[in-house]
Regions:
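Two-component histidine phosphotransfer core
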Residues: 1-164
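Short, solvent-exposed loop/turn segments at secondary-structure junctions
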Residues: 111, 179-180
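Short C-terminal beta-strand
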Residues: 170-179
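Intrinsically disordered, low-complexity acidic/proline-/asparagine-rich linker or regulatory tail/stalk regions
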Residues: 185-189
Length: 189
């Protein structure tokens, strides 16, 4: 379909511009989600009816500053590992706000994190915290650690970062921050 190809080419062009614009390292959540939506559209064209997605983030969060390319690696991992089962696969991006914090949740309908995967991520993150600088990790598996480290640098100690499984055993990764406190929450679900 010509319209689909045309829209995908436009999205790819905008994605490339977003990625290569090094003048901006901080964007609004609105800009980041717009980029993620374009990425998901391209993945939908690739996987067609096997992939569904939804983005439902509270309007009041859209002007929050975030590091550029902070959500896309989470979504990319959700597609990569969430498709380890029979389609259709669904990626959901949602938000939660309470009186002292907000968070963005990326969930998939895949098989979830294995205990071994959760232990590895936890070990890699703890290693990166203890040994600041470039983590000594293989290229494969840097996505979650990279997101954690960049989010921690950006937010200082006001960080929410969770990964694990939902009540129905699907994968979930959450990032967020506290409004007024110096609390830090790093949790393996």
């Amino acid at each position: 379909d010509t319209d689909t190809v045309e829209k995908m080419c436009r999205n790819l062009s905008r994605i490339m511009r977003y990625i290569t614009n090094t003048a901006e390292t901080t964007v609004t959540l609105r800009e980041e989600l717009d980029y993620v939506q374009k990425y998901l559209y391209c993945m939908k064209v690739r996987y067609q009816s096997s992939l569904n997605y939804s983005i439902d983030v509270d309007e009041s969060l859209l002007d929050q500053p975030v590091p550029k390319l902070i959500i896309q690696p989470i979504v990319e991992n959700a597609i990569k590992y969430g498709s380890d089962c029979e389609p259709p696969w669904t990626i959901t991006i949602s938000s939660t706000i309470n009186q002292n914090s907000w968070q963005i949740d990326v969930t998939d309908t895949g098989p979830g994190f294995t205990e071994k995967a959760k232990e590895k991520i936890n070990s890699d993150i703890m290693n990166a915290i203890r040994n600041p600088g470039m983590p000594a990790l293989k290229i494969n598996g840097l996505g979650t650690v990279n997101v954690f480290l960049r989010w921690k640098l950006f937010c200082k100690d006001d960080i929410i970062f969770r990964y694990g499984n939902t009540a129905d055993s699907h994968g979930i990764v959450s990032i967020g921050r506290y409004f007024q406190t110096d609390a830090e929450e790093f949790e393996q679900a």
